[in-house]
């Protein structure tokens, strides 16, 4: 068959590859979101990036300020808790000291009734010689308190002192609680004031950022519209030039000379070729007819070869069948000979066994035969 897949021109391949690369670059510029530069305000985008970084830095500084404030408030709260714990510890220690010093069991009102040595502390107030008194003239009786009035005065003074001391401690505790509450209120007020100030600053920063972003978006929109109008105008001009070029090109005018190559007259340009001439078509048909004849002769030769191979295969199969028949006959004859040999051998073995049983193994050993063994210790 006539072959038309001729080697292409290197210059043509280079031009096609250059156009393909330019188209890929153009598509990359238009469709790559990260690296696109046509139709986008790069300066505005960079400004937005810087603005976002500045906003993130402000937020980080605010977070750091909040963290510092929280740390300060936590420290103050820990100090207040520590002071409250110390105050409670001091108060409990004072109460315990008071109980140990002023509220002993021996100083209680009921101690006089339960003290077994209370009577022995008092002596006879008038006379020490018991010889002058009889049994009916006793001066001191069990349970009698001669200094009851002085004891009552002392107890009242002690009670008044304890009450005054408790009142002073309660007043000091109330004043301490009032100071702690005042300090806590001041801290909360300072925290609320600081939070309100930070909220106001944050709102002002947000308003400024919104204003700047709106202005940047307006400028970007205006620049984008201008670039779109310019691009549309350039696209229209390029389309008109392309239409004019196609109308006046050799493709639409069907110029047969453009398909010829000066350096290789036997080769044509595929994209400019308009068809073959009558002589070329006749030559192709003649070549095809010759190829058909050659193919027919080749098929006939292949059929002869296949017939020869078939007859040879048939002969080989018949020879194999004959060999198999001979092998089966030899195997049958061998099995017959082997059977007769086995029968003769069985007869001989049977006769040998009868001879052994009837002649050799007839004399059975007696007990006297076994007594001749193991008669010595060695």
Curated annotation (Swiss-Prot):
Any one cellular-component term (Gene Ontology): sperm flagellum
Keywords annotated in UniProt: Cell projection, Cilium, Coiled coil, Cytoplasm, Cytoskeleton, Flagellum
GO biological process terms, semicolon-separated: flagellated sperm motility
Superkingdom field: Eukaryota
Main location: cytoplasm
Localization per Swiss-Prot or TrEMBL: Cytoplasm, Cytoskeleton, Flagellum axoneme
Any Pfam family matching the protein: RIB43A
Coiled coil: 153-250, 279-334
Family membership noted in the UniProt record: Belongs to the RIB43A family.
Subunit (UniProt): Microtubule inner protein component of sperm flagellar doublet microtubules.
Protein name: RIB43A-like with coiled-coils protein 1
């Amino acid at each position: 068959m006539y072959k038309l897949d001729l080697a292409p021109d290197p210059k043509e391949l280079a031009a096609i590859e250059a156009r393909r690369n330019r188209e890929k670059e153009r598509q990359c510029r238009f469709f790559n979101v990260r690296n696109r530069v046509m139709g986008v305000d790069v300066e505005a985008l960079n400004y937005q990036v810087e603005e976002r970084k500045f906003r993130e830095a402000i937020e980080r500084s605010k977070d750091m300020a909040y963290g510092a404030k929280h740390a300060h408030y936590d420290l103050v709260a820990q100090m207040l808790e520590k002071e409250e714990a110390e105050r409670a510890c001091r108060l409990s220690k004072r109460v315990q000291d008071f109980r140990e010093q002023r509220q002993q069991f021996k100083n209680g009102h009921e101690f006089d009734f339960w003290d077994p040595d209370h009577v022995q502390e008092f002596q006879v107030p008038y006379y020490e010689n018991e010889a002058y008194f009889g049994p009916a003239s006793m001066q001191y009786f069990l349970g009698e308190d001669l200094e009851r009035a002085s004891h009552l005065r002392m107890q009242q003074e002690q009670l008044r002192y304890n009450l005054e001391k408790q009142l002073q401690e309660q007043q000091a505790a109330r004043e301490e609680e009032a100071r702690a509450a005042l300090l806590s209120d001041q801290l909360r007020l300072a925290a609320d004031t600081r939070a309100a100030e930070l909220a106001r600053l944050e709102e002002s920063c947000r308003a400024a950022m919104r204003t700047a972003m709106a202005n940047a978006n307006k400028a970007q929109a205006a620049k984008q519209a201008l670039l779109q109008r310019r691009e549309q105008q350039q696209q229209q001009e390029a389309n008109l030039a392309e239409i004019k070029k196609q109308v006046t090109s050799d493709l639409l005018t069907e110029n047969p000379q453009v398909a010829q190559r000066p350096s290789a007259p036997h080769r044509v340009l595929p994209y400019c070729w308009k068809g073959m001439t009558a002589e070329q078509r006749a030559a192709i048909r003649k070549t095809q007819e010759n190829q058909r004849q050659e193919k027919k002769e080749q098929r006939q030769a292949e059929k002869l070869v296949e017939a020869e191979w078939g007859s040879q295969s048939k002969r080989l199969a018949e020879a194999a069948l004959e060999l198999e028949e001979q092998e089966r006959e030899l195997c049958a004859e061998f099995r017959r000979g082997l059977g007769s040999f086995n029968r003769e051998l069985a007869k001989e073995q049977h006769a040998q066994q009868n001879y052994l049983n009837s002649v050799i193994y007839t004399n059975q050993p007696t007990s006297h035969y076994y007594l001749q063994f193991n008669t010595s210790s060695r």
